[in-house]
Amino acid sequence: FSATNDAFDSNCNLVINGGKVFASGYGMPEGGLDCADESGYRLFINGGEVVAIGGRHSTPEKQSRQPSVQWRLDKLEDGKTYGIDGVSSYKSVRAYQMGGATLLFSSPKLKEGKSYTLSIDGEKKEQIESLKSPTENVGNMRMGFPF
């Protein structure tokens, strides 16, 4: 958890092979998971339960062994529960506004190519397909603030 920076900032290749990872970073340009991809480093998610929230994240590589889903939200409200079809959920511990927030879930329960629905406090919002590298398919939730 970081109140002012990236939550998990490796500055080198970042490989997650298992366990439970919860990374809550600051808003733009900071994020939950940062491997310094702008410098050529890469993020691989091969296993485990991963929830990352922040302004932006490094995007998992296509060579990752486990799929992820990722949404770009105009805002994220404090105290709300964000979940995907009973696979994983996250209860927000702070609000993200104006710069928006990116929410990433990865779990061995996700199946590549299957569509999942983001819900907020149990209300279904938007469906998106899971991919090993979700850059190509990021859901956009317009919730009050323009990008």
Where are these regions (language model features)?
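A composition-driven surface/loop motif
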Residues: 1-147
